[in-house]
Regions:
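N-terminal Sec-pathway targeting helices
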Residues: 1-17
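Amphipathic repeat-derived elements
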Residues: 3, 58, 77-81, 245, ...
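Generic signature of intrinsically disordered, low-complexity, basic-rich segments
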Residues: 3-4, 20, 184, 243
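Generic alpha-helix detector with strongest preference for long hydrophobic helices that associate
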Residues: 5, 9, 54-56, 63, ...
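Hydrophobic alpha-helical membrane-insertion segments, chiefly the h-region
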Residues: 16-27
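Short linear S-[DN]-x-LW-Φ motif typified by the pepsin-like aspartic protease active-site region
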Residues: 26-120, 127-146, 150-170, 176-179, ...
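Short, surface-exposed interaction patches in beta-rich subdomains
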Residues: 179-181, 186-187, 195-206, 211-323
Length: 323
């Protein structure tokens, strides 16, 4: 490699690192990502838009697609709320709204290729893009092969969706809510936002957060729940469902629907307390360094839940869950 090329690459790398440091400093000072975009301190860069001419602009603020042409949906949103739900219409429809009229480069970009509908926030390299709200509606009888939806700064709600394989959703600073969706596998993750799953039916369910809270009330064969500092609340765990739940400093609250089966429940915390409501006997293995066991326990090794709880300093409290 020529010396001039090497020098140019080093300079480019240093500029990128400097820009990342400036953005990080602003975020630490309490400036939101959306504020950085609006004041021009942050440029939106969506890699695939820069090289793929097949993306089209949502010129009128709304688009519709035949459900026969769409088998998968890939959504990436930056700032603003997202509502993704089933409705009474016969088309897959999307609409975006902003507080002011959008310039061409600020409009949503979409691409439909080989059955995959890809949606992106705007064109590549935009600055001063206003916050935009997105509504995406699919027919009630439409089933996707898979759905992958992510948002950076803004709340996202998914409701009444049917997915053959995996429904994957993620948020950075916004709250995430998934209601009454049916799929084989549901994966939800957030950094500082909360995750709420209500009324969903799936074979396997996985939820992870860093500081956001987790709330789950769903039907599943397997559940994996994990948070660093956020609290976890898992209610009405169905029979035969195996649960693996872990938190570092957050509190775990869990209730089982019944105690007439040999389901496996594992809960692991460091300093967080564990509240457990089992309507009957259980085979409990409680391992702790300095925590206490409180409440009434009916110990049994027969046809009842096998519960393993491990804490460092967190207590285990048996009985009805606190609000």
């Amino acid at each position: 490699m020529k010396k001039a090329v090497k020098t140019a690459l080093v300079i480019a790398l240093l500029l990128i690192m400097a820009g990342a440091m400036l953005v990080a400093v602003e975020l630490l000072r309490g400036t939101s990502l959306q504020e950085l975009v609006n004041n021009g301190s942050f440029t939106i860069s969506v890699t695939d838009l820069g090289v793929d001419a097949k993306y089209k602009a949502c010129e009128s603020g709304a688009e519709s697609f035949s459900p026969d042409e769409v088998q998968r949906i890939d959504l990436g949103w930056i700032a603003g709320t997202v509502k993704f739900e089933s409705g009474n219409g016969q088309q897959i429809k999307l609409a975006e709204q902003a507080a002011r009229e959008l310039k061409d480069g600020e409009k949503l970009r979409w691409k439909l290729e080989n059955g995959t509908l890809s949606l992106r926030y705007c064109a590549n390299g935009q600055r001063n893009v206003p916050e935009k709200d997105l509504t995406l509606t699919v027919p009630a009888d439409w089933t996707a092969e898979w759905i992958d939806a992510g948002a950076t700064s803004g709340d996202m709600t998914l409701r009444g969706l049917s997915v053959e394989k995996k429904l994957e959703v993620g948020a950075t600073s916004g709250d995430l809510r998934v209601e009454n969706c049916v799929c084989d596998r549901l994966e939800a993750g957030a950094t500082s936002g909360s995750v709420t799953l209500q009324g969903c039916v799936c074979r396997k369910l996985e939820v992870t957060t860093t500081s956001g809270e987790i709330a789950v009330r769903c039907e599943a064969e397997e559940m994996s729940l994990g948070s660093t500092s956020g609290n976890i609340r898992c209610e009405d765990v169905p029979p035969l469902c195996e649960v693996d739940c872990g938190a570092t400093s957050g509190t775990v609250r869990m209730s089982l629907r019944d105690a007439q089966n040999r389901q496996q429940i594992k809960i692991d915390t460091t300093s967080g307390d564990v509240y457990l409501d089992v309507p009957g006997a259980m085979d409990l293995d409680y391992d702790t360094v300095s925590g206490d066991l409180r409440g009434s326990l009916t110990q049994d090794e027969g046809l009842c839940p096998r519960v393993e709880v491990e804490t460092t300093s967190g207590d285990l409290i048996l009985g009805k869950l606190p609000a």
